[in-house]
Amino acid sequence: MSVLAVRDLEVRRGLRHVVRGVSVDVSRGEIVAVMGASGTGKTSVLRAVAGIDPIAAGTVAIDGLQLSAGPLPRGETLRQLHRRVGMVFQFHHLFEHLTALHNVWLALVHVQRQPQADAEKKARALLEHLGVGDRADAMPRELSGGEAQRVAIARALAVGPPLLLMDEPTASLDPARRGELAATLRQLASEGRTLVVATHDEEFARVCAHRVLIMEEGRVAR
């Protein structure tokens, strides 16, 4: 069963097409790496799936929720989208004035309306699961690149989305940390998560992904 189904997706920047006619299905528990040079549309595909950039044409279906061309998702559609999709950005985008733990439980309180005590308990469990439980009270500036990334993954997973999107996850990691990240993503996939990862890192894609898509000039070339 496909968690993500993209059909004839187009994304534009002004008058310029940055994504052209992309179609892909991703199954539950599958890791798909999207590769290509800078400017080929990798990140734009992820941002359209996440509802950050508008869809110019085509459709995106995530676990039964369909997005189509038009304005960005709002209201109940946006809330449903946030329950289905978590995104880890290249530079993590953690809130610098909040602890690692607070960064993770925030969405549980504001999106799922959980009591703060319950949200903190779940957030601690996620941080422990990802190997950074001892950094729960650290501020983002006190975290290493690998630690910050794991906190960002925990935050993206907090509301239990079936789909996780990652943009250039190895950019700030040394080779050892890249291997650890690949193992973490494989573990998440074995637990039933579906992952789509935009990356320049061919070795990481080979080790981590079940399938690799190559993008050229906004299209899936192979």
Task: Please tell me what each predicted stretch does.
Residues 164-167:
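Catalytic Walker B motif of ABC-type/P-loop ATPase nucleotide-binding domains
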Residues 50:
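Helix-to-loop junction immediately C-terminal to a conserved catalytic motif
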Residues 139-143, 147:
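Conserved ABC ATPase signature
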Residues 175-177:
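Helix N-cap at the start of a conserved alpha-helix in ABC-type nucleotide-binding domains
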Residues 67-86:
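ABC ATPase NBD coupling module
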Residues 158-162:
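A short, proline-enriched helix->beta-strand linker immediately N-terminal to the Walker B motif
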Residues 199-200:
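H-loop/switch region of ABC-family ATPase nucleotide-binding domains
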